[in-house]
Amino acid sequence: MNKVEIKRVLFVCVENSCRSQLAEAISNHLFSNHLKAFSAGSRPSGKVNPKAIASLKRIGIEHKGKSKSVDEIKGSDFDFVVGMGCGDECPNIPGSKRMEWNIPDPKKYGTKKFNETRDQIKKKIVSDLL
């Protein structure tokens, strides 16, 4: 029986409060047999957006993440670094395969947009990382 190699992935956005938090939680909850996910921001807000937490809860995911800086994860090794749409503000992490998903930030919108963003992220995880 072959052992599946668990890939380490870092999701990065500017504030580490919405998109990257959604991606981290979905990866670790639904795809933990394949991925170990982390998230960080180039300018973290200091808190996870409550609408992101509520969106995850609607699909049965309890998320207790915290908004953190990319400085807190420097020196860690990742197989993939995924920019969620932060452009030039996303850091370059040496030795990692870089992807840019360009997912719009839902923070100014309501429940429907957060759910759409969550579902879009889940589809990208399946298509690009598994």
Question: Where does each model-flagged region fall?
Answer:
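Short polar/charged helix/loop
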Residues: N2-L130
